[in-house]
Amino acid sequence: MKVWILQTGEPLHIDGEGQRPMRAMNLSNKLIESGHSVVLWSSAFSHQSKLHRSKRYTSHKINKNLEIRLIPSGGYSRHIGLKRLLDHAQLAWNLKGLLKREKVKPDIAFIGYPPIETAAVMSKWLKKRKVPVVLDVKDLWPSMFVEAFPKVMQPIARIIFYPYFYLSRRTINDATALSAMAPAFLNWVLDFAHKDKNKNDKVFRLTSPQGGVTKEDLSLAQKWWDVQGVDGANPVVFFVGSFMSVFDFMPIAIAAKKLKNIQFVLCGDGDYLRGVKETMLGLDNVIFPGWIDRPKIEFLAKISIASLATYKNIDNFIVNTPNKIVDALLLGLPILSPLKGEVETLIKSNKVGFTYSDNIPLGDCIQFLINNDKMQKKMSENAKKLYDEEFDFDKVYNSLVSHLENMVKNET
């Protein structure tokens, strides 16, 4: 089976060590493991490093079953902004030009959405050639654009972004099948596009492979954390990720002022890091160690009592299961999050953490875990069990590969 994958904004096999594999790399690896060949289309610009892998179109033959094709674009310096939209438009334009010269079509394609523009260009090209397409929807673009505006401005914003709404609905309807990370998310996408669900529309959880961290790695990580003053002598809760506008760190500041004996370890970087540091001024129990690698994350989890998933309650997360939730389950830690909807249901029904709010502050949830060691351990066990049942990497991606194989069989 010849498979095309289109996914920008994720790490690639050519990016070197220390990268966290996401949908594109994970699916590529599983397909190759199953004996299939993959052409992975992506951007020549790295979303993670904000650097160009190449300034022009390049093709990289990784092995006999994997080729990576890099589409050039202008790039951008911030996660959110006009430059990113311009980059995506240029990316789609260049992809369209490359496809005009393409002579070989795949048996099936798996297209990441967003970006809207590249997904639209490739799905249209494939539809004309009667190639089945699975559209993997991971974010609620362009609705997220409108949500970023004050409510009074949202009707105007919806008019401004109308072309994106038109293009996204057309692309979703053109797809042979949809995939999403949570049932509520899939239903939202179908409602948004006014599309009936079909037998090929499926939920495939966003998850990552385990392993790869050795005892030596953990030993080195422990020494590094000792230097940072994080050794587990005091209870620890932590956040790992990019400091972005989609997170609300104010509840952490309030909890840190109240719980002076707790260490709040906030790891990562991003556009909003400076603002978060200003919010935490004078709080010696809040630690910013910067970006950390996998061994440091795993050791930090071993000495922590809970993981923080401080998402704002916006539609994109209310109907979804964001990666910070999955990460906590993988690490076997109780989840502390304000998210309603899909995540709140998951937390309550599986007893894997707490949903904090103005009525049930974050600090109270943390104090409860400290005072109830048996409950903390039980929630940790529940988290591991839930991960194994619903988010296990091999189960998810073996199922996804089988799904693609069956779709191709049914087309022939």
Task: Please place each PLM-identified region on the residue numbering.
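A short, active-site helix/loop in glycosyltransferases that binds the activated sugar's phosphate group
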Residues: F165-D201, Q210-V213, T345, L400
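Conserved donor-binding/catalytic core segment of Leloir-type glycosyltransferases
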Residues: Q210, W225-F247, A253-A256, V265
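A short, well-ordered alpha-helix in the C-terminal region of glycosyltransferases
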Residues: F368, M375-E390
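Acidic donor-binding loop of glycosyltransferase active sites
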Residues: T176, A301-I318, L333
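Membrane-proximal helix-turn-helix segments that form the acceptor-binding/catalytic region
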Residues: W93, K100, E117-A120, K124-K128, ...
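N-terminal subdomain of nucleotide-sugar transferases
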Residues: M1-H60, A177, P209, I254-K257
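Conserved acidic donor-binding segment of nucleotide-sugar-dependent glycosyltransferases
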Residues: S349-I360, F368-K374
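Nucleotide-activated donor-binding/catalytic signature segment of Leloir-type glycosyltransferases, i.e.
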Residues: N234, R274-F299
